[in-house]
Amino acid sequence: MARVKRGVQARARHKKVLKQAKGYYGARSRVYRVAYQAVTKAGQYAYRDRRQRKRQFRQLWIARINAAARQNGLSYSKFINGLKKASIEIDRKILADIAVYDKAAFTFLVEKAQASLAA
């Protein structure tokens, strides 16, 4: 049986990792062992941050909605509760967009929420 040598596969694997590490500083882009660690860690950060991005955007939307609602004399929690009672189903992303770019429409929504809370 012939001896199996893995030089070709090793070279390909090393090239793949070094290609992924392109643009990294110093040994992180040149030395396979260091580059492998850097690429692995980068993958872990990317995986974690794809999930964190969703949380961070929701936090941003809530902060914007809260600021706009308070300018109209209503807290965030009461505003959201009022919208639910008024059967207005607009998600936080769209509400934040309305709060930033269309203040008149947001004021209208706040009035609807206040009316449903009073009723």
From Swiss-Prot:
Molecular function GO labels: rRNA binding; structural constituent of ribosome
GO annotation, cellular component aspect: ribonucleoprotein complex; ribosome
Tagged with keyword Ribonucleoprotein: yes
Matches recorded under CDD domains: Ribosomal_L20 (cd07026)
Family matches, as Pfam families: Ribosomal_L20
Listed GO biological process terms: ribosomal large subunit assembly; translation
Keywords associated with the record: Ribonucleoprotein, Ribosomal protein, RNA-binding, rRNA-binding
TM stretches of this protein: none
Superkingdom in the source lineage: Bacteria
Described function: Binds directly to 23S ribosomal RNA and is necessary for the in vitro assembly process of the 50S ribosomal subunit. It is not involved in the protein synthesizing functions of that subunit.
Family statement drawn from the similarity comment of this UniProt entry: Belongs to the bacterial ribosomal protein bL20 family.
Record's protein name: Large ribosomal subunit protein bL20
Provenance organism: Colwellia psychrerythraea (strain 34H / ATCC BAA-681) (Vibrio psychroerythus)
